[in-house]
Amino acid sequence: MKLNLSLQQAFKSPDLALKRAHIKKAIETTLDHVEVKTDSEIGIACVDHEQSHRLNLEYRGKDKSTNVLSFPSDIPEEVLPLLDARPLGDLVICIPVVLDEAIEQHKTAQAHFMHMLVHGTLHLLGYDHETSDEDAEEMEALEIEILAKLGLENPYQEQ
């Protein structure tokens, strides 16, 4: 399985060094864990509060910025065999929210960013924690397992 990654850093912070190789590894580990075998592509945009707030309001009706927004690809299934890689969609990650949450949750910014990558990628694959308690438990369990493979602690465990 090959992953094509498009990374746009519209917002950068000295408190979070983003390394393309680490980002790619987190996404590839997620895809491998849920047994995605096809070549895939994903877009990631790192944004500020203002962009996140605007997108969250426009697409989810929520009047605030948020840590990660997931926009799954809407390419029709019948077109996919014609493509070199399956477009999974795009993630929009609000770096200031990730940094604030990391402090609140007593985590490193890097660990929380990786969690948001895994979480968002699972959303792109159709997992949803807002539909039912069972779905939330399944998604959290997957996140814990994937993050462990990346050498990161359970993000839901109290620090």
UniProtKB/Swiss-Prot annotation:
UniProt remark on cofactor binding: Binds 1 zinc ion.
UniProt xrefs under SUPFAM superfamilies: Metalloproteases ('zincins'), catalytic domain
Leader sequence residues: none
Record keywords, A-Z: Cytoplasm, Endonuclease, Hydrolase, Metal-binding, Nuclease, Ribosome biogenesis, rRNA processing, Zinc
Record keyword Nuclease present: yes
Pfam families according to UniProt: YbeY (PF02130)
Gene Ontology biological process terms from the UniProt entry: rRNA processing
Gene3D superfamilies tied to this protein: Metalloproteases ('zincins'), catalytic domain
UniProt cross-references to InterPro entries, sorted A to Z: MetalPrtase_cat_dom_sf_prd, YbeY, YbeY_CS
Residues that, per the record, bind Zn(2+): H119, H123, H129
Keyword check for Glycoprotein: no
Subcellular location: Cytoplasm
Primary localisation category: cytoplasm
Protein name as annotated: Endoribonuclease YbeY
Phylogenetic lineage: Bacteria, Pseudomonadati, Pseudomonadota, Gammaproteobacteria, Moraxellales
